[in-house]
Amino acid sequence: VTAGYYTAACVFAGSLMRPLGGALADRIGGIRSLLVMYTCASICIAAVGFNLPSAYAALGLFVVAMLSLGAGNGAVFQLVPQRFRKEIGVMTGLIGMAGGIGGFCLTAGLGAIKQSTGDYQLGLWLFASLGVLAWFGLHGVKRRWRTTWGSAAVTAARV
């Protein structure tokens, strides 16, 4: 029952932050917002991987990580119409699909790692590493994205 309450707290926090993350992205920019959110989430999730002595400390860090990821979700949806003007529908569908698959793979992966190693440490660090990888990926393409946004050659759908 306690694990269910903790899960609900994380899901609620992430969901609540989506519109606020979109508003923040409108104010400071979607890319900048996402870079901050990836940093915060990665640090919090990596910290939980150090086997904290208190379940409440772990919960607090997970909630902050989920707040960050929820805000990042809002930032992603702020970026979609800027980057993919003619494919907004398909892109939002793909983003939603990726989120659903990612949520499934995360829980399945963490469970498999726990079963094979006896704890979640490696899985949490791998998950934090994905945030770092996303940060570097976004940082690496941001200049190219900014110079090609709105270009019909880049954003037009092709079959």
What are these regions, as identified by a protein language model?
Residues L24-A25, G109-G118:
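Interfacial helix-cap and linker-helix signal at transmembrane-aqueous boundaries
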Residues D26-Y38:
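Cytoplasmic membrane-interface "Motif A"-like loop-to-helix N-cap segments
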Residues V11-P19, G100-F104:
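Residue-level signature of mid-helix packing/kink "hotspots" within the transmembrane helices
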Residues L122-G140:
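Symmetry-related core transmembrane helices of the 12-TM Major Facilitator Superfamily/SLC fold
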Residues A71-F84:
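Intracellular juxtamembrane helix-capping segments at the cytosolic ends
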